[in-house]
Amino acid sequence: MKKNSHFKYIGIDPGKSGGITLINGKDIKTYKCPQRTEDMAILFSLLIGDTSSYDVKLLMERVWARPNNAVRSAFAYGVNYGQWMGIIACHEVPLQTCLPNQWISYYNCDKKLEYQERKRWLKEKAKSLYPNLNITLTTADSVLIADYAMKEHFKNEE
């Protein structure tokens, strides 16, 4: 892995049962998404600290309502996504998004896996990359999104 200079890489899985992960050199922190908007904002502020917004490389999974989602579930998902967007904008951090298949395919996850199997596979992949980090099904996606951001998505911006 090449040297990643001074950037802080943040990956966000924006669902209510998602997470946020920061990779800053060898320092890696991952958190379950807080339930309250105020707590989301506080956590984000703590993660970026006094870092210039130009030194934060943030990648959030792009979400949308799917036909098989219940209306209430899709609305809650969209609200959380919008809250993250607002918090990020208030900190003037440039936001980039990626589709789930972009970052998932980077890790060569079998596309034929059922949802729960895929979630477990991604958790194990995250654990193999960061064995000293306490990774759960809730935080695994954000860990991999941050890792993908650092190794692939922003590789030409260093």
Q: Model-flagged regions — what are they?
A:
Residues 1-158:
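Phosphate- and other anionic-substrate recognition elements at nucleic-acid/protein interfaces
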